[in-house]
């Protein structure tokens, strides 16, 4: 695609029918903002030549895409789609574009192949738009044709049969291709003389026809995937379709997915051929599951990495965690951001880790909290052990040396270090460093007293 063609996403609206405080384009599908699916569909065609018009709660959209190479244009007042184009015009011109494809930010089912097709079909047009024929056109803008040629697009609420004739079933999808040189003279002529009091991008069509420009309405059959998401029911429908599309893609790519109808996978997740997933299971964000890894049912992963030969057992929760090769996690384990398991490390049931590392072969079998900790190779953490890392104001680190053995029900009060090969007796409260190859016991002495006879 030539570098003079770009894309504009309209994402400034409130989406009141979603009954939510956040912008409609931030409603989540498979753990991702709806807007991301639109951006992902456009990126292979336009690269970084994609702008997004934001308005309502723009701050939330900025935060959702912080750190990413996204370009935004602000529409302070939401005065319609035509006004949104006017707000973006200077940016589009400054980028040296000849053509721009305009899409709505609430079309998560939009496919890259559809955009490719549309660009080829509209190559010679001054203005082109995609249309569908629906048995029930609903609230979508109607396409008016005279002798097969496009005459205008009329919003449903403004349609008057006395002016335009019998109401057609062909509707506008809201996807446009505009030649900037042709449209530039038309933009200032948009008015808000309609029932909504808004400036419609659709009015450019009628203006262009009046100027005898080349206007095309490109028909795409009855594909509902081109339509926007306007309410919770449509959001759930779109999510179901995308979930199926993504899961089938992974299966066809060589991933073994059991009960695939119960598995949810983010479009940003990477699952290598030869990995095995048991449903129900949820894999979100930039998670990566390597070849030969197994994730069992009822697990939840976000931005987690699981290397080959590792097994994540049922009911485990991993977020921002890294699981090395040949590891075992769970069942019922929780690995929070910054948790790292090196090769052949093991974490059992009801173990929680946060900003903690288990080096090669280290084990924490059950009922343990490891926070802000470094556990050396081959060390063993007994049941009920906790690192007391927070003093009410600051966090402190615990270091456990290679080959150390921490007895059950031990409290390690950070900052503290247990040296290599040391043994900590069960039930100890360790407040001072333990030298290498030492035995540390810090608990009250047991006293046995005879019971008094019952009266």
UniProtKB/Swiss-Prot annotation:
Biological process, per Gene Ontology: cell morphogenesis; cell wall organization; lipid A biosynthetic process; peptidoglycan biosynthetic process; regulation of cell shape; UDP-N-acetylglucosamine biosynthetic process
Subcellular localization(s) per the UniProt record: Cytoplasm
Source superkingdom: Bacteria
UniProt-annotated stretches for the region Linker: 233-253
GO CC annotation, single: cytoplasm
GO MF, one example: magnesium ion binding
UniProt cofactor note: Binds 1 Mg(2+) ion per subunit.
Record's keyword terms, sorted: Acyltransferase, Cell shape, Cell wall biogenesis/degradation, Cytoplasm, Magnesium, Metal-binding, Multifunctional enzyme, Nucleotidyltransferase, Peptidoglycan synthesis, Repeat, Transferase
Region Pyrophosphorylase, annotated ranges: 1-232
Annotated acetyl-CoA binding sites: 383, 389-390, 408, 426, 443
EC class: transferase
Pathway membership, UniProt: Nucleotide-sugar biosynthesis; UDP-N-acetyl-alpha-D-glucosamine biosynthesis; N-acetyl-alpha-D-glucosamine 1-phosphate from alpha-D-glucosamine 6-phosphate (route II): step 2/2; Nucleotide-sugar biosynthesis; UDP-N-acetyl-alpha-D-glucosamine biosynthesis; UDP-N-acetyl-alpha-D-glucosamine from N-acetyl-alpha-D-glucosamine 1-phosphate: step 1/1; Bacterial outer membrane biogenesis; LPS lipid A biosynthesis
Cofactor: Mg(2+)
Binding residue positions for UDP-N-acetyl-alpha-D-glucosamine: 10-13, 24, 75, 80-81, 141, 155, 172, 230, 336, 354, 369, 380
Positions that bind Mg(2+): 106, 230
Catalytic activity: alpha-D-glucosamine 1-phosphate + acetyl-CoA = N-acetyl-alpha-D-glucosamine 1-phosphate + CoA + H(+); N-acetyl-alpha-D-glucosamine 1-phosphate + UTP + H(+) = UDP-N-acetyl-alpha-D-glucosamine + diphosphate
Active site: 366 (proton acceptor)
Keyword flag Glycoprotein: no
Record-linked PROSITE patterns: HEXAPEP_TRANSFERASES
HAMAP family documented for this protein: GlmU
NCBIfam families documented for this protein: glmU (TIGR01173), PRK14356.1 (NF010936)
Stored PANTHER family: BIFUNCTIONAL PROTEIN GLMU, NUCLEOTIDYL TRANSFERASE
Family designation: In the N-terminal section; belongs to the N-acetylglucosamine-1-phosphate uridyltransferase family.
UniProt protein name: Bifunctional protein GlmU
Species, as recorded: Nitratidesulfovibrio vulgaris (strain ATCC 29579 / DSM 644 / CCUG 34227 / NCIMB 8303 / VKM B-1760 / Hildenborough) (Desulfovibrio vulgaris)
